[in-house]
């Protein structure tokens, strides 16, 4: 899991630092935010102190009505040694009790001009993206007709050469050799290339080429949601391969299962065209058009008609 610090959030959203500067390197370990309204009312039994605290007009207007002694005590309880930051929305005035408590405990107090709900959604999306579970897979990721296709297989089977042919046919390369994958949601996997090898493609006998330089900016993209895996393997004599496409194989990446197709490789097979058509067929299946099922139904009808004629 990637590390996010308060400083990263401050720079990403151009937040104004009010106090507690010594704590800007505190780690943020979860994407959930806290609106500490009930805590300001005095109930701290289940206070999620490890979350980023977000104060809006509702919380601060209630806080203004508290007695002076209660104000100091509530802010001291709000600013703990593990609280990453306290953020105020709408450029609202900062209570002096909050500034004092934040300086004592080193909790950064930040301010944003955004409305509370808008700031909350943006913060949550940013943290979920940065804190998502990640992994790396040896393969090639290509955007084919809007379908994110992860091409896997043993080294030397022809993944990069296939990707090069797909790029020449107008599709877009995302990553070659190493694909960094993060799970942004329960069923959403997004892949990208490591910074070091972004836009690069390695072809045996040719070396490393820069796809963006050779084919233009339209031939690459920085990231893509992965929707199907195509595993290339050398053709094994006697092994039974799927010839109808009725059964779907699944592959688990992190906690998400996605469709996997095994494509046998042998001389004379145009892998780029096969993968291209497989991506198009996958889109058709998602639209409810399954050629294999239609063929099976027609075959069953023909057999049934033949039995009736007898």
From Swiss-Prot:
Subunit organization: Homohexamer.
Homology family: Belongs to the HPrK/P family.
Pfam families: Hpr_kinase_C, Hpr_kinase_N
Primary role: Catalyzes the ATP- as well as the pyrophosphate-dependent phosphorylation of a specific serine residue in HPr, a phosphocarrier protein of the phosphoenolpyruvate-dependent sugar phosphotransferase system (PTS). HprK/P also catalyzes the pyrophosphate-producing, inorganic phosphate-dependent dephosphorylation (phosphorolysis) of seryl-phosphorylated HPr (P-Ser-HPr).
Record protein name field: HPr kinase/phosphorylase
GO process annotations (BP): regulation of carbohydrate metabolic process
Binding site for Mg(2+): 160, 202
SUPFAM superfamilies, per the entry: HprK N-terminal domain-like, PEP carboxykinase-like
CDD domains linked: HprK_C
UniProt-annotated stretches for the region Important for the catalytic mechanism of both phosphorylation and dephosphorylation: 201-210
Catalytic activity: [HPr protein]-L-serine + ATP = [HPr protein]-O-phospho-L-serine + ADP + H(+); [HPr protein]-O-phospho-L-serine + phosphate + H(+) = [HPr protein]-L-serine + diphosphate
Underlying gene: hprK
UniProt-listed NCBIfam families: hpr-ser
Enzyme Commission no: 2.7.11.-, 2.7.4.-
Organism encoding this protein: Bacillus velezensis (strain DSM 23117 / BGSC 10A6 / LMG 26770 / FZB42)
Top-level enzyme category: transferase
